[in-house]
Amino acid sequence: MFSRGNQAAAMLLVLLSGLAAGAGYAAQKVQGWGKVSMHGAIIDTACAIAAGSRDQTIDMETIPLGQIIRDGQGMTKPFSIELVNCILERPGNKSDWKFFQVTFDGYAEGSLFGVQGDARGVALKINDSSGNVVIPGEPLPMEEIIPGNRTLNYSMTLMPNHQPLKAGAYFSTVRFKLDYF
């Protein structure tokens, strides 16, 4: 009825059909399942930093070179760090939390934060909401810890750095840390 070649082909077709049907059945069984992964940390600090504040990207936008020359600076963009679940009490014999300091760090260019990329002649200046200029690596003045949640507001401005200006894309990474006392 079937030649040896046709018998082998027919047998292979039957086996593959069985595998495909089994895979379809297995896929139907698994569709009702899922997985949730999580992570977190327990910290010994007065406040936690809100998830949306830990890793931010600020779009400084595209501006004409002439605007920096005319205005003496580029655009200013606001950003903030949200502190959550702040407490004053510490467990055990440790003294209560009272103050904190914020320190920003990154590629320093004098009192400014340097940029990388094709653009030249510019750097970034950061100010806090009290008008204090943020110097890379130097802590800002101490502030009192207030229980609950709190938003720390800052602004970032593109500034000339007294080098020849050159158009191009730029980027920078600025890290921050909080120390509690």
Task: Please name every model-derived segment.
Residues 18:
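Short, Gly/Pro- and small/polar-rich lid/capping loops
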Residues 2-7, 12, 22-181:
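Mature extracellular/passenger domains of Gram-negative fimbrial/pilin and adhesin proteins
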